[in-house]
Amino acid sequence: MAEGPSLHPKLQVDSNIPIEISSQIPQEPARNLAFQMRQSPLVTPGSTTKSSLSVPERNLLKQESQGPSRQSGCMLLSDKYVNKQTGPMASRKFRKERTVYTKEQQGLLQKHFDECQYPNKKKIVELALSVGVTKREIKIWFKNNRAKYRRMNLQNIEQVLPESNGSSKAVSESTHFPVVASDNGESMCSGTFGEDSIPKFNCS
């Protein structure tokens, strides 16, 4: 059989050599693009604004961005502090235990109170040792007892005042001047107190 026409020896390509023409063609523009980006990077809208701002303006922007976070941190700290102060533990600390005295102790303290309502330091120490409490508790007992004594006196005064007012009105209404007699035995004048407490004279 006749063989087909053979290619020119110069145009013949060795089949063993890989053909890289198609793969090399698109890579060259990519390399050129990478090189161009290194020489002149792309300019985005954000980069233009940042570069146009001066240093003080950038600092202001940073402070504004950090401001709300700092304020929120302060608010959280203040809330924690308020919760600590107004919690149940804080109310328990301010509660004071009340000292309960026996009848004998109360009688002894009342006896000294009747003698002196303001005991000196020496007397307070003696009472604290005899009763078995602290000096502070003795001072508190005397203070409370003085307040109680004052309240009782005020109540007694308020009860006495209305009675005295009523009796004074009755006395003023029924008070008469005695009849003044002359040497001849004839009455000269007599008088009575009126409602306005001004004496009225009736002369004869």
From Swiss-Prot:
Lineage: superkingdom: Eukaryota
SUPFAM superfamilies: Homeodomain-like
An annotated GO cellular component: nucleus
Compartment list: Nucleus
One Pfam family of this chain: Homeodomain
Phenotype upon loss of function: No visible phenotype; mice are viable and fertile. Female mice lacking maternally transcribed Obox1, Obox2, Obox5, Obox7 as well as zygotically expressed Obox3 and Obox4 are infertile: embryos arrest at two-four cell stage due to impaired zygotic genome activation (ZGA).
DNA-binding region: 94-153
Main location: nucleus
InterPro entries per UniProt: Distal-less_Homeobox_TF, HD, Homeobox_CS, Homeodomain-like_sf
Similarity comment text for this entry: Belongs to the paired homeobox family. Obox subfamily.
Keywords: Developmental protein, DNA-binding, Homeobox, Nucleus, Transcription, Transcription regulation
Region annotated Disordered, chain positions: 28-73
Function: Transcription factor required for zygotic genome activation (ZGA), a critical event in early embryonic development during which the developmental control passes from maternally provided mRNAs to the expression of the zygotic genome after fertilization. Together with other Obox family members, required in early two-cell stage embryos to kick-start the major ZGA wave by facilitating RNA Polymerase II 'pre-configuration', during which RNA Polymerase II relocates from the initial one-cell stage binding targets to ZGA gene promoters and distal enhancers.
Species for this entry: Mus musculus
SMART domains named in the record: HOX
PANTHER family: HOMEOBOX PROTEIN, OBOX1-RELATED
GO molecular function per UniProt: DNA binding; DNA-binding transcription factor activity, RNA polymerase II-specific
Tissues where this protein is expressed: Specifically expressed in oocytes and early embryos.
Annotated protein name in UniProt: Oocyte-specific homeobox protein 1
Biological processes per GO annotation: maternal-to-zygotic transition of gene expression; stem cell population maintenance
Keyword Cytoplasm found: no
